[in-house]
Structure formats: C-alpha cells, structure tokens
UniProtKB/Swiss-Prot annotation:
Belongs to the FtsQ/DivIB family. FtsQ subfamily. This is Cell division protein FtsQ. Residues 1-52 are cytoplasmic. GO terms for cellular component: cell division site; plasma membrane.
Amino acid sequence: MAQTIKRGGKGVRRATAARSAQRKVQTARQQTGSVLDSVLRWLPFSEETLHRILMTLILAAAAGLVWTVAVMAGIPALVSEQAAIIASDAGFKVSHLEVRGVNRMNEAKIYERILGQNDRAMTTLDLAALRDELNQLPWVKDARVSRKLPDTLVIDIVERTPHAVLRKPDRMVLIDDTGVELESVRADRAKGMLVLSGMGVGQRVEDLTRLLDAAPALKPQVSEAEWVGNRRWNLTFKTGQVLALPEGDETAASALLSFARMDGVNRLLGGKVAAFDMRAPDRIYMRVPGHADEVAAEKRAEEQARAEAKRAASAKSDEG
C-alpha cells in the first residue's frame, strides 16, 4: 500500500517569509546607518559631542520643569524671604541714607521717597524701582541708587539747571532749558533771569534758545520773550524796548540777525525808539514815544499860523 508523506509546506513558507523580512530590516538598518553616518560626517562635531549636547538639553529641560514646579509651590519666595531675614539679622539692612549731588532742590523730597526703605534688608532692595521713583521729582535730571554694605543706601543726584522763569497768571515758575517746571519762585528770586510768557511757551524753550543763538551779541540783552498767538515771538530787551519778530523759525532768526547788524551800526538799543516791528518782509517799523503828539502839535501850530495870516490879510484888505 502506498503511503503519502505530508510536508510542512506552510511552515517552510513562514520561515522563508521571516528570513525575507529579516533581510529587509537589515537592509533598512544599513541604509539608515549610512544616512546617519553621512549626516554626522557633515556636522562640525563628533558623535560623542552630539550625545553630550542632547544630554545637556535633556537635563536643562528637566531642570526647567523642576524650577517651574518649585515656583508654583512658592519655594523660591520662601527661600528669598528667609535669606532676607538672615541678612537683616546680620546687620545688612538699610540704616543710613547718603545723598550726593543736591545743591538747589529740597533734600527732604528725596528722604520722603526713600523713607519706606528704612530697616529693609539690603538684599531685597529694588534699585531700579527706586531710581525710577526719584526721577519723577521735578529737580532730578538723573539719579543713581547703589548699596554700600553693610547698611547704607547711596543716592547720587544730577540736578536740572534753572534756565528761565515762566510767568503764569498767578505765579512765577523756574524752568530748565527743556521747559520742565522746577518750582514756584518769588519775583525777587526771578530778578535777572530770562522771563517767558505766552500760551504754550513752555514747549518752545529750546526753539527760543536756537533763535537767540542766531544773534549772540543780542542774546544777553534779552530780558523777556513772549510767545504770541502760538506762532511768533516778541522780545523785550533790558532797555525796555520791544522787537516784534515774524512767524517761522528761519524767518525769525534771519530778522533777528538783521536787527543785530543794524544795532551794531546805528545803536538802536538805548535810543528813542520804543518798539521795532519786523513782521513785514524787508522793512522795519519804529515807534517813538510822544512822536505822534509832537507831530500833532506841529500840525496844530501850522494851522494856527495859517489862520492868523489869513486874518491879518483880511484885516489889511478891509483897511484898503
């Protein structure tokens, strides 16, 4: 009797398929390795350095995560507070205040701003915030705040320089060369200083400085400057004479320079003319006090003389 022997056909096929898959995986690994090798060859550092960089990034990310959790739990604040207490107990707290550079302003204004820092731990001082607060004072152009261990807070002040006096309806105010108002002053303190007036003149201080710089010979002779109608200047000299300038920065500077030249030749300042008007192009008008009265008196005298001559002629005709 014939016997049929069955072979494991399916097992053979599975083994063949497994070997084929293994070859594909090995081929893919070889190709991937080749690609990675190619990339690594192009990098400016070795594979070991790359591993170190990756490890550093992982550790940094982990540290950031730990710090975030700590902040959310309030741990840094507690540590900072405890450190401040330790520093204060060791004598590192604000016990003295040293102020430098104050000549004109009221030094008490600075102490008022810093008073809340007394007995505070030196480690908890916000120097930038203190500086910003001091810079809000009108007289302070700039301030620097620093620690002098163990217990002194040092304030260095750069003061603004008074430049002129702003005349307001109810008071006189010192201003610097940029128009910043410093403090109210009495009239006797304003004596000898340039006086400014007019609506919006505080925003035109630097423009006025440039205008007066156009005629250096006249600049020290100007005692007052009025900003008229938000468009032009009237200058009053120490002699009491007034010069009306035209509108426009360049036009006004040119007119002032022309006036300076005429004054150098004809000595206009200190003369009989009370007011000079240079608003019209290429000409100047002058007003002499009492001149109109003199002209009117001369005219009346001429008319009276003519009337008397006419009466005399009429009387002589009647006699004839």
